[in-house]
Amino acid sequence: MLTNADREQIIAQYQRGESDTGSPEVQVALLSARINDLQNHFKAHKADHHSRRGLIRMVNTRRKLLDYLKGKDLGRYTTLISQLGLRR
């Protein structure tokens, strides 16, 4: 589970302005951190199907945000993908 300190660190790393918390880069970075955290959870709890549904929903939301960013600004998209280590 992400702590508030982790969340603030991610926001500070990917924000575009002083008080930016809603840009696609920040949203994708936060979703990626939550997805990675849940993947570690599933290594220990293989039968947790309820949380798996939430994981799939987060992955789909992240994919939609990445598609939006790719159409809006390809440079920001490629930078974000390389920073997060996502394969697309």
Curated annotation (Swiss-Prot):
UniProt GO MF annotations: rRNA binding; structural constituent of ribosome
Database matches in InterPro entries: Ribosomal_uS15, Ribosomal_uS15_bac-type, uS15_NS1_RNA-bd_sf
Keyword Ribonucleoprotein found: yes
Stretches that traverse the bilayer: none
Annotated keywords: Ribonucleoprotein, Ribosomal protein, RNA-binding, rRNA-binding
GO cellular component: cytosolic small ribosomal subunit
GO biological process, one term: translation
Cystine connections: none
Record note on quaternary structure: Part of the 30S ribosomal subunit. Forms a bridge to the 50S subunit in the 70S ribosome, contacting the 23S rRNA.
Family membership noted in the UniProt record: Belongs to the universal ribosomal protein uS15 family.
Protein name (record): Small ribosomal subunit protein uS15
Species name: Psychrobacter cryohalolentis (strain ATCC BAA-1226 / DSM 17306 / VKM B-2378 / K5)
Name of the gene: rpsO
